[in-house]
């Protein structure tokens, strides 16, 4: 079955967006020394899944379903990015040990400090216009996932 132009564009975006975001993440990591924290890794996993799902859309029917699942994975990464950005901006506490929490319960402040990972989730490694990488992941991933979903719905109505 041949896909309509909107569905083809959705499939292209479902592959290109997470691949480019992962490429940017690895470029910033290995090219510029911005090493990922635990929550940064959480944001990458849905993008890996989205790339795999989008590739399936090219080789295995039903392409629309695989593309929709890829869009869902992309939006999931965006949601994790929103949570991570909120931790970085102090809107809410982090749920992992990579955010520095006053008094981790050991009763030994030095031990708490020594057990805190070197790359902390509650401190943005880099910002542009006051937005962290997690914030940009939220913006790009959420917008891309919604655009892909819209293209797929447009295709269904045609």
Question: What are the functions of these language-model segments?
Answer:
Residues 1-46:
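Transmembrane alpha-helical insertion/packing segments
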Residues 5-16, 59-78, 145-147:
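Interfacial segments of alpha-helical transmembrane regions
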Residues 17-24, 50-53, 73-83, 140-147:
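Membrane-embedded alpha-helical transmembrane segments of multi-pass integral membrane proteins
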Residues 23-29, 76-92, 107:
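C-terminal TM-helix exit segments that contain a strictly Trp-centered aromatic cap at the helix terminus
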Residues 39-49, 128-143:
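Membrane-interface loop-to-helix entry segments
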Residues 42-55, 104-106:
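Iron-sulfur (Fe-S) cluster-binding segments and ferredoxin-like electron-carrier domains
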Residues 55-62, 149-156:
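Structural signal for the C-terminal ends of transmembrane alpha-helices
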Residues 89-134:
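Extracytosolic (periplasmic/ER-lumenal) interhelical loops and adjacent juxtamembrane/interface segments
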